[in-house]
Amino acid sequence: MRTEKDDRKVEKSYLIENWLTLNKTPFSQWKTETQHKNLLLMCLEIFEEMETELRKEKIPVKMDFREIAEDKEILCTCQVQAAVCALFYVLVCEIHPVQVLFSGKDQTLSFTATGGTGETERKADSERLGTSRWLALQYLQSVGYDVKISRSGKKELISVTFQTAGKAVRNRYD
């Protein structure tokens, strides 16, 4: 008998496998029928805003998801690379969005996820994040990104940092 948890795993696997197809679809044609897809669209907008700042000013950018979620003025002007979306998507969908902090400088974006406060929450978050990291690593390495993962502190912060490996990864317009 299939459970809701099994259905979520199948759905996530399907989405990750089809990320390249999704990335080739023009932003305006994306459907927003489920909460996860709405969240993904928001992630795309957030990263377009971040990348624009990083390209123009070459300054560090650091934002809390809660602050961004309330900003309705962010506009997406072009497609963000699939690797960025995939990594952020698996992290956000596995833990509560306000527990994700991301920052960027030059060609590197960092994602930091904090575990829950209770022991039971921490254990559950740790298991979910383990799955998320595995999926993200597989995907990002398959499209040519170097990925570094580290843990630090008593709060069990989990940082996932990536930057383009050697040469730039081709985007959907190439």
Q: Where would I find each of the regions flagged by the language model?
A:
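Glycine-rich/acidic phosphate-handling loop/turn and adjacent ATP-lid/helix
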Residues: 107-134
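C-terminal end segment of the histidine kinase catalytic
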Residues: 142-174
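Conserved glycine-/histidine-rich ATP-lid loop and adjacent helix of the Bergerat-fold HATPase_c
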Residues: 133-145
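Conserved catalytic submotifs in the C-terminal HATPase_c
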Residues: 60-71, 105
